Amino acid sequence: MSGIPFVRDLEFKYGAVAQVSPLVRRVVAENPGPFTYLGTGVYIIGRGDVAVIDPGPMMEDHFEALKAALKGERITHVLVTHSHMDHSPLAHPLAKWAGCKVYAAGSAIPSESEVRMEAGDDLRFAPDVVVKDGDVFKGSNWTIEAITTPGHTSNHVCFALKEENALFSGDHVMGWSTTVISPPDGHMGDYFASLEKIRKRGFSTIWPTHGPPITDVAPFLDAYITHRQAREQMIIGRLKAGDTLIPKMVEVIYKDVDKRLHPAACHSVLAHVIHLVETGKVKADGPFNLTTEYHPLAAA
């Protein structure tokens, strides 16, 4: 049902540094998986004085690959899009090695779910400097702007490279898949607002942390938003059909998906249901969880 023009082909070699644009290099960590796709792509911005975006997992071979890629250069900023285990654990070791600071939009809210979502929360992570929307970081030949994008997590932030009109999107937008939104740290209403915020900026290229770049940005973001809206209409349809419990909805909506993924799908549907309650389309009989019953309202 998605209609999203996914891009999934990426030529790379684990641990090798690749020049992917005039100002951007990438090193991919060897941590492939169902949520990380081919692995965590670490971006190095500039030459000489550089910024590093999403250093990735704490893997010794990956750390050594980054050191080799950065030999003879000076890291001025370590930038983290959000505190998940595939993005942030190497941030402080890398910053300590380089003698610089770690910048991010705060720490994570611990998950209340027993279902492992993505690589897990990096609960030990806290930035040296908390970034705010619109903060600007400069190097000798690059300018990066922080754009706060809560939704996937409460502390998610993207980074815009002004010289190339490019966005480093973390997990906010991914070319190979849709993004996981898992309450309470994930919030669908915030996610919709953050997608629209990015769409209005008119970026030429989006570089997700996982997978290849998105180069046809406007149609891709439109499809991303339309997919989420269609999912909410499907949920309303199931509620009107009498499926008042989220697990029952998931059995129908995700009938063609591996049942082992249904627990994670339940949390995605919960995020949508919370948004529908907040926008006056659905009523909850209790707290927001998987055992509460939900009902459509006239506005739906």
Predicted regions and their residues:
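Residue-level signal for inorganic ion chemistry
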Residues: 23, 66, 210, 235, ...
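C-terminal regulatory/interaction regions
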Residues: 3, 237-300
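Short, structured coil segments at secondary-structure junctions
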Residues: 20, 97-98, 202
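Metallo-beta-lactamase
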Residues: 50-52, 57-59, 114-128, 136-138, ...
